[in-house]
């Protein structure tokens, strides 16, 4: 069967695009499974600890003996969905297979800990070991998996026919991974990205969408949202009732969103200067349309890195007053210890990755999707391997996963700039980054900031997101939402499980912040709306027509660039 509904939010967290930190997507995903220097250090470390290593292997042998005798008490955790079928524990043979698998996995994990590697080598080795363990799970084996065997009996083997067809289709074109969502259930502009609005500015780089107010009164200062550049913009405008943009305009906040054009090889030279310049153009257009000299601005993931650099440029040129408020959504500006991806990166690979994207003229979003899936294969490869191929069923219907599959390309120039920015941690040191002829110093961005992170986010870990409170020069309000990455943002008030943590202070240490944080039940969307309301001026009558300041509607939302392939 398709993954249970309760698991969709978790899968969405893990399926969100990486954008910036996945700096080596161009080199291909399976390269990570090849032994490297970290693997050699691991082997040497174990060889230098023969007593400890021997004790671990002896314990494994003893446990395997207990498994064979039927006296082992090993059992998979209840939360491990791979072994939820009662047959895994009720069938004597299957129980022994699972117990042997668990025993070997625990021993491997203990050996990695025994090696006492530094944090980077430890993460690299654990990545390899955990991924191999996921691949070798008995749940991935046809007929050994009891659900697969039952499906074969019930359908007279038709499940394997359907699964084989799906496998051939998925492997025929990028990304060569199991399909994660039933894309036939969604259509952009029909049941997703449907909040009414119009394109009021179109350049070769972007379309600017103004959303139609849905209240009689609106706040005079509008909000501009800057999305990532490797997926389409509508993560903030998903299905009705789950759209942040819809929520904003239904509550009196004027909203604009950038929709990036999908670049091709001809646009290879577009770099950070190009995209910051485009955001400046959009910001100017927002102010013209609304007849104001200020706007609030926020971004999402890597889009917020571009927005942050734009804010730094405004500060350097004496125009920061144009920003009434600033937001950072699941964004890492300080890449110190930036999680697994930071550990996996190395200079040689980064140079090769930039060379590959330069030859193509772009980084293909499908390569990025494939690489990201192999970062969490247990959930993003093997989960769907079982559902799609062994059971012969369709993947789930879920709007975030549909958005995630709708990838775009990133220009070679921007790819190289993101790689250098992340690896050299340029935003941490004032003046290390120069954009449009100005040195960027984020401490000069003293606009009030609203930051959101996901507590389960392994792409942009919340502790790394929190460090932005120390980089920016203004007063920050930090929100720690449930879930991870994009699912932390798609958190409407109708979600009964929604909650978030907040504190009145922002100490330097994120763990100290957590100790003082209070848990609020419900969505953080109303909190953000109230925060914006305090900074977005007085209410005024909503405009009757879209456009203004010499800009007129060019097309209905969601525009035309969102359909580029």
What are these model-predicted stretches?
Residues 1-207, 218-219, 256, 321, ...:
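Amphipathic, low-complexity, repeat-rich surface-exposed segments
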Residues 117-154, 161, 288-292, 306, ...:
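Alpha/beta-hydrolase-fold enzymes
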Residues 215-289, 339-340, 492-509:
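Cap/lid segment of the alpha/beta-hydrolase catalytic domain
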Residues 262, 456, 481-500, 504-507, ...:
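Histidine-bearing beta->alpha loop at or near hydrolase active sites
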Residues 283-303:
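Alpha/beta-hydrolase fold nucleophile elbow
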Residues 404-440, 447-448:
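Mobile cap/lid helix-loop segments that gate and shape the active-site cleft of serine hydrolases
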Residues 451-453, 457:
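Short beta-strand/loop motif that positions the catalytic acidic residue
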Residues 461-471, 482:
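Short alpha-helix in the alpha/beta-hydrolase fold that links the catalytic acid
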């Amino acid at each position: 069967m398709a993954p249970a509904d309760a698991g969709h939010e978790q899968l969405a967290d893990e399926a969100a695009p990486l954008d910036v930190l996945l700096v080596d997507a161009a080199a291909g995903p399976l390269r990570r499974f090849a032994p490297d220097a970290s693997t050699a250090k691991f082997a040497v470390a174990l060889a230098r600890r023969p007593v400890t290593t021997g004790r671990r292997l002896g314990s494994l042998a003893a446990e395997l003996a207990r498994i064979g005798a039927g006296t082992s008490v090993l059992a998979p955790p209840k939360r491990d969905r791979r072994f939820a079928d009662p047959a895994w524990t009720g069938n004597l043979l299957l129980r022994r297979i699972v117990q042997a698998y668990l025993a070997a996995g625990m021993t491997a994990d203990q050996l990695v800990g025994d090696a006492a590697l530094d944090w980077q080598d430890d993460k690299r080795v654990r990545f390899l070991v955990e991924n191999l363990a996921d691949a070798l799970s008995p749940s991935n084996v046809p007929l050994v998996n009891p659900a697969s065997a039952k499906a074969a009996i019930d359908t007279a083997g038709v499940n394997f026919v359907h699964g084989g067809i799906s496998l051939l289709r998925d492997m025929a074109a990028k990304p060569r991974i199991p399909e994660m969502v039933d894309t036939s259930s969604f259509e952009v502009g029909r049941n997703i990205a449907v909040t009414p609005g119009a394109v009021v500015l179109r350049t070769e780089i972007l379309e600017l969408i103004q959303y139609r107010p849905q209240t009689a009164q609106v706040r005079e200062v509008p909000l501009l949202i800057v999305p990532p550049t490797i997926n389409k913009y509508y993560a903030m405008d998903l299905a009705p009732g789950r759209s942040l943009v819809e929520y904003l305009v239904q509550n009196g906040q004027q909203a604009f969103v950038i929709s990036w054009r999908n670049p091709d090889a001809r646009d290879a030279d577009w770099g950070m200067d190009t995209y910051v310049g485009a955001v400046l153009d959009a910001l100017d257009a927002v102010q013209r349309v609304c007849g104001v000299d200020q706007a609030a601005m926020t971004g999402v993931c890597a889009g917020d890195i571009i927005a942050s650099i734009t804010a730094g440029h405004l500060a350097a040129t004496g125009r920061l007053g144009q920003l009434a408020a600033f937001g950072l959504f699941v964004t890492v500006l300080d890449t110190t210890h930036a999680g697994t991806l930071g550990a996996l990166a190395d200079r040689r690979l980064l140079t090769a990755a930039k060379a590959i994207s330069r030859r193509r003229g772009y980084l293909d979003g499908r390569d990025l999707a494939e690489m990201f899936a192999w970062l969490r294969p247990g959930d993003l490869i093997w989960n769907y391997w079982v559902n799609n191929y062994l059971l012969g069923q369709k993947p789930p219907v879920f709007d975030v996963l549909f958005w995630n599959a709708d990838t775009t390309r990133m220009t070679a120039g921007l790819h190289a700039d993101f790689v250098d920015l992340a690896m050299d941690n340029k935003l941490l040191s004032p003046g290390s980054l120069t954009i449009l002829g100005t040195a960027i110093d984020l401490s000069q961005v003293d606009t009030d900031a609203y930051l959101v992170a996901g507590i389960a986010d392994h792409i942009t870990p919340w502790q790394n997101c929190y460090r932005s409170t120390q980089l920016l020069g203004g007063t920050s309000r930090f929100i720690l939402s449930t879930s991870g990455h994009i699912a932390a943002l798609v958190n409407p008030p109708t979600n009964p499980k929604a909650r978030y943590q907040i504190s009145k202070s922002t100490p330097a240490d994120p763990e100290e912040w957590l100790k003082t944080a209070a848990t609020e039940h419900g969505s953080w969307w109303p909190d953000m709306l109230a925060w914006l309301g305090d900074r977005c001026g007085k209410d005024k009558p909503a405009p009757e027509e879209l456009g203004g300041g010499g800009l007129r509607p060019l097309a209905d939302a969601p525009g035309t660039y969102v359909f580029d392939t």
